[in-house]
Amino acid sequence: MDVMKYNDLRDFLTLLEQQGELKRITLPVDPHLEITEIADRTLRAGGPALLFENPKGYSMPVLCNLFGTPKRVAMGMGQEDVSALREVGKLLAFLKEPEPPKGFRDLFDKLPQFKQVLNMPTKRLRGAPCQQKIVSGDDVDLHRIPIMTCWPGDAAPLITWGLTVTRRPHKERQNLGIYRQQLIGKNKLIMRWLSHRGGALDYQEWCAAHPGERFPVSVALGADPATILGAVTPVPDTLSEYAFAGLLRGTKTEVVKCISNDLEVPASAEIVLEGYIEQGETAPEGPYGDHTGYYNEVDSFPVFTVTHITQREDAIYHSTYTGRPPDEPAVLGVALNEVFVPILQKQFPEIVDFYLPPEGCSYRLAVVTIKKQYAGHAKRVMMGVWSFLRQFMYTKFVIVCDDDVNARDWNDVIWAITTRMDPARDTVLVENTPIDYLDFASPVSGLGSKMGLDATNKWPGETQREWGRPIKKDPDVVAHIDAIWDELAIFNNGKSA
C-alpha cells in the first residue's frame, strides 16, 4: 500500500495546491451563511477545497470543502485514488483479525502489513506547534474564531470538524470522535454526542467512577487529515485512532500533552480547546440543519467549558456544513464505502459488493450482492450487516441481491426487487432496534424498525414454483450484428450500404 506523504494539515494543503485541488478566496466572505452557500455550490460541481483568507470580521482564515471529493478523501488517507482505499480496508480487516503467517511465502506476502504496523505507536513531543500561542482564563473568547452559521434556521454558530479527545477512568487509550458543538458563550460549547458514541461512554464511566468531579475534554481543530479520517473509520476496538492515522500517513502520529489536563492531542493541530464538562450541566442543543436535509429536534446535551485555547501562529480554522446529500459527510461515505467492502468480505466471503448510496444519507440504506449458496442465505447476510460493524447500527434498509446484479446501479437493483421478491415472503421487519436520534420518522427517539429486502433468486425451500430464467442473447448473433453495425448506419442519418 503506497502512501502519499504529508505531515500536517498545512503540508496537505500544499499538496492539494500543487495538484490544483485548492482555491484561495481573497474576497471578504461572511462565515454567517455565505461560506456555506459557496462551499455547497463548489462541492456539487466537484470543485476544489476552499481557503477563505479574509472571512468578514475575523483575522483567521477558514478552510472548507477539504473532503469535498472522494479523490481528496483518498489523498487524506494516503492513497492516490479511491480504488486504492480497498487496500486500506484489507489492512483494517487484517488488524481486526490478524492471522499468523502460514509459511515463508505467506510471511513474505504479509511483510508490507507488518512493516506498516511499525508506524502505529505515537511519538510524544515536549513542545508542539499547536501550543505556540496560549490563552487561558478570562482571555478565552471563542467568538474570535470564525465559527460558521450554516443554515438560516440554525440556533447559533456551530463547530463541525472538532476532533474531541476523551479518556475513560483507569484507561491508557484515548477516544477520538467528531461531535458537533454549538457556541453558547465566550467559553462554552454544547457537546452533542450520542449515548453510544465513545466520548459519551467515556463520560458515563467517569461520572460513575468520580461522582461530582469535572470530566477533562480537549478538542483539536485543524488536525492532519489522517487523524481526522481515523476518527470516522471503522478502526478495530483494540486499535487507537492515532495508531491508525500513523498507518495511513506512513509516519508515527506526533502528540503532545495538553496544558491543563493529561489528554494528548495532535501536535500539529491548528487550534486546541482544553476544558471540562461539569457533571449535570446541560443545555438545549439545536435546531440545526443536518445531513438528512432537515432541521433536527432540540435536545439536551452536556456543556463543554473551555479553560484554555492553544494554537499555531497564523492558525487556520477548519470547518464544513451538513445538509441534504451531497455534502461532505456524503462524500466521505462514498470513499469509506470502499474501506468497508474488504472488512465485510473477510467476515462474509460470499459478499461480492456492498454499497451505501449517498442519497440514502450515507448509511441509512445498504445494497449487498452475494454469491448465494443456500436457502435463507440473504437473511443471514442482512443480520450480519446490522450486527458486525457499529457503523451500520442505524442502517434502516438492507437490500440483498445476487451477484448478477450491480449493487451500484439502481436500474439493476430495482429490476431485482420487482422480479425476485414477494413482499410478504421476502421482507424482513425487525422492530425496536437502535435508530439515529436524528431520524424523526421513527416512532420513538433513538428506537425504530429495520427492513431487509431479499431480492435474490429463490432456492428450493424458499419457493415451490419453477423459477424464471433470465433472458440471454445469442453470442453468435451479437458478434454478427457487431460486425455489420456500422454498415446499418442507423444513427448516422444516412442510408445503409
UniProtKB/Swiss-Prot annotation:
Its cofactor is prenylated FMN; Mn(2+). The keyword Amino-acid biosynthesis does not apply. It is found in: Cell membrane. Prenylated FMN binds at I178, Y179, R180, R192, W193, L194, R197, G198. One of its GO terms (cellular component) is cytosol. Keywords: Cell membrane, Decarboxylase, Flavoprotein, FMN, Lyase, Manganese, Membrane, Metal-binding, Ubiquinone biosynthesis. This is 3-octaprenyl-4-hydroxybenzoate carboxy-lyase. It comes from Shigella dysenteriae serotype 1 (strain Sd197).
